[in-house]
Amino acid sequence: MLAIGRKKVERKGWTDRVQLIEGDSADLPFEDGTFDGYTVAFGVRNFEKLEAGLTEMHRTLKPGGMGVVLEFSKPTVFPLKQIFHFYFHTLMPGVGKLVSKDAAAYSYLPESVEAFPEGDEFMQIMQKCGYRQCQMHRLTSGIASIYTGIK
């Protein structure tokens, strides 16, 4: 992933402005209050230690800084809920087995989405980790959600 990112940064001519770093979400290599904000897209559900990762990202925010998390969620509206469930749990893993050498990746995604705390439950975890003014915005009838919180 980082190798692909480095190639993109080089191609865009951003090597003087962008630094890619590999690290542990629960032990970030940055000083307290370093950032005005952060964004994480479809990655927080993969944290081994969700609360530790959120707390650590909170630590790196400046006072008043905003954390933004985009994650998959489970739609609740008929018939999208049923269509999404069939696609995510049956069709995608089945096609993944046929076309990929890593069939486990296609079953991991729906499993990780099912296990991830969403909605009010995730916002309560954010609050426990120090965020305030937590909000959630559902996208595409609930297939994904954006969570925000302020330090």
Predicted segments with their positions:
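C-terminal lobe and adjacent flexible extensions of AdoMet/dcAdoMet transferase-like proteins
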Residues: I125-K151
